[in-house]
Amino acid sequence: MEERVERATKASRAFALVAAPVLVALVALPWWSDAGWMRLIAEMAYYLALAQLWNLLAGYAGLVSVGQQAYVGLGGYALFYLTGAQNMNVYLALAIAGPFAGLIAIPVSFAVFRLRGAYFAVGTWVMSEVFALSASLIAVLGAGSGLSLTPAILRQISPDRSSRDAILYLMSLAISVVVCAIVYLLLRSRHGLALTAIRDSEPASASLGVNTFRTKFIIYVATAACTGLIGALIFLQKLRISPEAGFSINDWTVVVIFMVVIGGIGTIEGPFIGMLVYITLRELLADYGTIYLILMGMIAIAVMLKAPSGIWGWVVQRYDLQLFPVGRRLVLAPPTPPQTSER
């Protein structure tokens, strides 16, 4: 028997064949659907991106942060300040918002990395509250009332509202696809192996030569930068930002944690499932106020009791399906018969 290493699975190949036309249809959505669907799918796209980033932190690097809303707010405020007070072009401000959030994450990481376990989670939340309180006290940021985008800024995107909606939708879709692709490729690399080693046992991974601090530092800062860019795009669509909205733990962290835990933490597929569950519940129960939050809590408890590894974790355990395989499999195959040439 011959041995060969495979990374793809039958399920992943079939999924790629299905996902490609779906992605093409989503890209073409502005030409065959209305603004309502574009706004909904754009929201699904940036929630998926946020969930993948938090899953990378908690599910693979073992950094259970409950303060990622800090970088959503920082990215949003950077966009509004640069376009408003500094009269910067909106696209340039978008490009700066992400690196700005990543830059702020550098000193934050040195503070919170001194903490472990639940203390790390609490520390990230405290830092987020510090940013929210600071924003509510700074007059140039609108203090407690926040900031709004002017019509002149919106015209930089497009003078036509329908074209502007289409551009913002495509930007949301693009950032979601890029984030998912980066996470997938990262986890397939040696850096992904280092992340999972740190998550499973930091002392053991350090003894094997993994630079644990540098690896966690890079992942934390990179996810903060991506989260800041997503936050800027979110509030560019919402047209207004305030400390309560930008640094909301419920909107940008609790919901994301729900998606990841329900779908399956430590899997790329999990955030997809969790996002669909959350959006479906919210849309079906939209007429009942916040009752969907109660139902979300009940579903979360039920899933954690019946399937601690999440919905996709249960699927993997039962059916061994992997749509985004990140590991390697050793496959035994019959030897290839030698070719004989006829004379």
For the regions a language model picked out, list residue spans one by one:
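Transmembrane alpha-helices and adjacent helix-loop boundaries
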Residues: 1-343
